[in-house]
């Protein structure tokens, strides 16, 4: 027997074909959401309050400080918030201190700052009763970037850009004449020396001393027509603020506010880290030749001689000195922007790699302290110097698409940015109120207006592009949605502008972003998925785990290092499937490694790291595809995406051929019930599980608290699928922490179960499986194999109208008792009733306009006080295709204290469940991108059958395999058949699964032919087919594209107001468009009357269509068509342009256009046809 048996969760064993012992288990898969939000609650909020605190008024007399904050308890729990359509949130209270400097008076108060949405345990938010997910955003990291392009003369030019988190951009560029220019915040370019003079390097000599004698600088100085700091400041001011009178003071304050004011310019900690890393000397001296001797000033020790090449060993020796003392200079400036502060730089001379003997200055920014979140003059000087070094081939340009230069903004940071907007608006209000109100009576509460804060949060959760309605089709869809990375959204890219490079797979994605899972269509490559082992570091960069290789001994250690993309670029990384001996050494002398984007073969003592697992490359959804290594990438992409669309079935079944990921995916998705503490099961019902905790005290087990886990029963998901949990433990079972005790939708025995295992034959059958169509056995319908439950929600509200309140009642005018048989005394349908299209769900009447009463009615009214009830029926009815069984009714009223929108007195929600069996036109798919539509459901006895007499359940077309190159499905077919016959479940992990030989061996073990083929017999004749056929067991999914949701038919219905043509689409109950090409077809056949009918009475001849309807109902002949409405519209259009247009007949007589006559309108109303753009039966 090949493979070994492993435990997949508590309830199932699988035989795995894996050969690699994984040293690291999978992390918590929704950690990216939870960690980020936790950071926000613990630190993000505090940072925000520190940023705006203290707020002072314009005189500096009143000071408002934020001291501390706390979150209270939420008003409703998660389930109740969903039920009541409210936001799951907790009140945020902030401790505020107001100081009056004149009187020395201090007032402290706790101020309520609005309800703050909380994250649920599963990483979602509940906003107005709907579950939403905040998707992480991939953006360019703030830093300094260098780029190169070739101009039209074939000359290489460079550009540099300093990108902050928020604030003005600073760009450097060269032109054809070798002059260096700078742009401040996308304005016109000025010579870079003007900016240097403004920083305080007034004279040419100072600039040349600072940057070295360089021809580029000399060219720039020639171009520069300023000669002092003052002139430079005025020049810059005129560029940034044209038309305003320039003064030196204004210019200084403008530059300070643009770049050196922390409130206006923010690099964020990540920007400071990236900037220091890029400009630090240790990265810039690597592989360069020194032009000076490096000596330790304190001890006189020589680190490196002049003329020495700095390789990695020398670099490691001098790094501590670079951090400490070598090369530091303080430059004094005069009259610059920051007055006379010294600029702290670090400078070392090297030889030019391209011109012999030329000395180049390398200037670092002197390791600016991490607390400086704004740019400093040292940064600017150092960035300009790096740019000049590039012109002499020292340094490197940056790749924007490298994941070392793109970072993630997760929930916490996105929320923080939004909260910052709200707080800054609030700060403005506070300042205004401080100056207006009486300073003695003032309190913190009176100053603070929390409206802008609440509004900005509401806006973010309600309408931001990154706050999305959770995809809840199945557990995998939920999980993937929380791990999604989007490059779109505010501050990101747009679909139209994103080019090819951004979307492409990059070598730095390895182990960080999945190269497979991304949508097809306009968003391809812009929306990605996090790889299975990846995590996010404090700066927002994606890290992936690696096993360290000990450089001395060559042992692969079990301790794990997490590396970001730019850290990894300098190392040789071996694959996870490199064979190791018992001690953990590489078996082979030469090991295949990756370094940047290249695949190299290196000696085993040169390997730095090794992958932890073969599946660390791919995302969770892709890691669920068995034999992924045998599939073409395009089809694997479809497979990953279609697993997310699988509908939860009535009776789910885990796959016989899995990848070993099924348990982890189910556990972390949040749909299964996971034990929080170890203990023993005390009670199990369909609705709850009780587990008694036990603690060990002095070696004895002592009973502790009781944990109660409630099951969700038949609840509607966001996508209308059914959420239903059921227990899978029995009374008396011992439970460990993390065990799955209850299955949710699409899980079975604690494993993800998106579809069913079915017997499939690959053969053609009478053309019924031509072009990917699927032939199905009726047995799958009879046995409810692919039956799913769908729940739809309908609501009706009783409002206050101008003519009086609407009323929910059983007493509806002109409705017979038969139609009311399922309503209770309130007029609301009872739970459990079976209903058809058009049945009443909630009886409701609305007052009609008051009419003049006749004398008799007035008399009756005077005697009985009862006016003839003037109401019309506005009941909620079941729409087309909505029939099913009522599973739940919820009634909310003002009297019960429910929060309802203004003007609404009563709200009724009705939930209808439908059992949908699989039917012709439904879409099905395997896990390898092999999708198709059901073409025919055939009687079981007519299906081809196996030698033992059992019929196959599905017949697929073998032509769907070779051209698509997804051979994984064939291997799955073989292995699945063997597993079914052996009665086992198998696991074949991605890139480390069963080899071809092992599949054949398992087939033989099960007593099947090694080629997996068998003789099949025709079910209709009993004759064997000519050739042996591949038959096996495949895991097939039923996808959310169900024919019941798409099928649609219309007789009459709503018409568009202007053109009077039928509306389009199922949602509007529209008609089918008879388009240009269809008209040509009728013309080609010469079907004149059919064509006339289609263009007139079936479309927009208003009078004609009413008459036609009447004629059909009365059984008369259909009348002559009139003039179509759209023709009248055309004439009106021409008349509106001032043309006199008439219609003439063949003998030049003017034709009067017949308008709708009164009698016709009456007829239309009789026939229940609404002509004025309203819809049928709408009122």
From Swiss-Prot:
Chain segments carrying region Disordered: 1153-1179
Identify the EC number(s).
2.7.7.6
* Disulfide topology: none
Superkingdom of the source species: Bacteria
Cellular component terms per the entry's GO annotation: DNA-directed RNA polymerase complex
Q: Does the keyword Glycoprotein belong to this entry?
A: no
Catalytic EC class: transferase
List the InterPro entries: DNA-dir_RNA_pol_bsu_ext_1_sf, DNA-dir_RNA_pol_bsu_external_1, DNA-dir_RNA_pol_su2, DNA-dir_RNAP_su2_dom, DNA-dir_RNAP_su2_hyb_sf, RNA_pol_bsu_bac, RNA_pol_bsu_CS, RNA_pol_bsu_protrusion
**Catalyses which reaction(s):** RNA(n) + a ribonucleoside 5'-triphosphate = RNA(n+1) + diphosphate
Q: Does the keyword S-adenosyl-L-methionine apply?
A: no
Q: Name one GO biological process term.
A: DNA-templated transcription
Q: Give the family, as the similarity comment puts it.
A: Belongs to the RNA polymerase beta chain family.
Report quaternary structure and partners.
The RNAP catalytic core consists of 2 alpha, 1 beta, 1 beta' and 1 omega subunit. When a sigma factor is associated with the core the holoenzyme is formed, which can initiate transcription.
What does this protein's UniProt record list under function? DNA-dependent RNA polymerase catalyzes the transcription of DNA into RNA using the four ribonucleoside triphosphates as substrates.
The record, for PANTHER family, names: DNA-DIRECTED RNA POLYMERASE I SUBUNIT 2
Q: What is the name listed in the Swiss-Prot or TrEMBL entry for this protein?
A: DNA-directed RNA polymerase subunit beta
Q: Which organism is it from?
A: Brevibacillus brevis (strain 47 / JCM 6285 / NBRC 100599)
Species lineage: Bacteria, Bacillati, Bacillota, Bacilli, Bacillales
